[in-house]
Amino acid sequence: MTTSFLHVDFQQPAEMRFNRARVRRAFVTIGQRHMRDARRLVMRRARSAPGENPGYQTGRLARSIGYMVPRASKHRPGFMARIAPNQRNGEGNRRITGDFYPAFLFYGVRRGAKRRRSHHRGASGGSGWRLAPRNNFMVETLEKNSSWTRYFLARELRKSLKPERRHR
């Protein structure tokens, strides 16, 4: 599966000044807000049903959600925010050791991985799921905050581009 991305290169006019630090701060703010909202979705202290957001028992999933704004290098400006459970080099997260738990929540687990006499799906009754798939809370967070993110980023880009002062 390939990921699509958009890259725009432009020459900066000599009479304009671009404040990169302000835009990077905007990405940090975006990452913090998305992390906060994703954590709130998995903080409900109730047993979750199939299709709902995961319930909160130990809090490990909620604490593992973090964000990362990569450092700028000579090849990349660092204008990006990654928000995910178990985010490597993430800010404000504690990693989950062992198997990747959010994948079990998203895909679910079928009952009876070992084949026995009655190995057919739901042969003993029930749905055939040991853990039915839950809602993808990260996608829900991104969709909920997409208009705010677009507005906030456009505002910060507008504020970061200033005309250069002319010396008389």
Annotated model-derived regions:
Residues M1-R94, F100-R168:
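Short, Lys/Arg-rich flexible segments
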